[in-house]
Amino acid sequence: MAPPSRRECPSPSWRFPGLLLAALVLLRSSCSDACGPPPTFEAMELTSRPKPYYKVGERVEYDCKKGYHHFAPFLTHSICDRNHTWLPISDEPCVRKVCHYIPNPLHGEAILANGSYSFGNQLHFICNDGYYLIGKEILYCELKGSDAVWSGRPPICQKILCKPPPKINNGKHTFSDVDVFEYLDAVTYSCDPAPGPDPFSLIGESTIYCRDNSVWSGDAPECKVVKCRFPVIENGKQIAGFGKKFYYKATVIFECDEGFHIIGSDTIVCNSNSTWDPPVPKCVK
């Protein structure tokens, strides 16, 4: 609340004594019994237009501003007293209107932005792990007519579920008999025995899990035969990764004979398309 004001009268100039004397008499007679503008409040406003000054005994009435309502039988008026000040209103009888209480959603939480349900505030919603929000994440306490109401319906927290992961050729995954998977449920893929002399290799991630957006964490892997040709290097030799056959992710390391230096990488890996990556290096002088 702004402090009550007292009407201050201007000091006259004496350049025209006759006229100013008469004006001074009139001015003093009105100002000496006058109060300045009435006090202002955060939650109340005048019911009539304010005047520049008020006579002793004049009374002004206040009412709650839009969005506020009376909560106690305190005074809602002030009077210009004989001391040319406004009788103070000790306590404002108006408080902000509030929206109705909204409980925590099942499997979630409702969080007030500043601990109050009064209009202008926000209510934030979050869900527990394993659940996702259906509806608006934030509701606003707004004025609708003379009431404080929420900007929408409270959201709900729905359990995160994934459909069964894809089946793959030449392989399988665990829990293949389950129809619905919950948040963070995981399945692991493996390859079947190959019908020929070379085994199937699992290409991709062997384990995937149900994520928070109800999709799997990655694509299903692939089971296929991956076999790279025997790596041959002239003027050099293989020093690691020996074998008769080279399947997926087989790693070979080379070095050049004395007097030669290597062009390319000394380490190569058999990748998923049955080629060496990077290519087999060369040894040159």
Curated annotation (Swiss-Prot):
Disulfide bonds join 35-80, 64-94, 99-141, 127-157, 162-210, 191-223, 228-270, 256-283. Glycans are attached at residues 40, 47, 114. One of its GO terms (biological process) is complement activation, classical pathway. GO terms for cellular component: cell surface; inner acrosomal membrane. Keywords: Complement pathway, Cytoplasmic vesicle, Disulfide bond, Fertilization, Glycoprotein, Immunity, Innate immunity, Membrane, Repeat, Signal, Sushi. Pfam families: Sushi. Residues 1-32 form the signal peptide. SUPFAM superfamilies: Complement control module/SCR domain (SSF57535). Residues 33-96, 97-159, 160-225, 226-285 form the Sushi domain. It is a single-pass type I membrane protein. It is found in: Cytoplasmic vesicle, Secretory vesicle, Acrosome inner membrane. Sushi domains 3 and 4 are the most important for interaction with C3b and C4b. Interacts with C3b. Interacts with C4b. Interacts with moesin/MSN. Acts as a cofactor for complement factor I, a serine protease which protects autologous cells against complement-mediated injury by cleaving C3b and C4b deposited on host tissue. May be involved in the fusion of the spermatozoa with the oocyte during fertilization. Also acts as a costimulatory factor for T-cells which induces the differentiation of CD4+ into T-regulatory 1 cells. T-regulatory 1 cells suppress immune responses by secreting interleukin-10, and therefore are thought to prevent autoimmunity. This is Membrane cofactor protein.
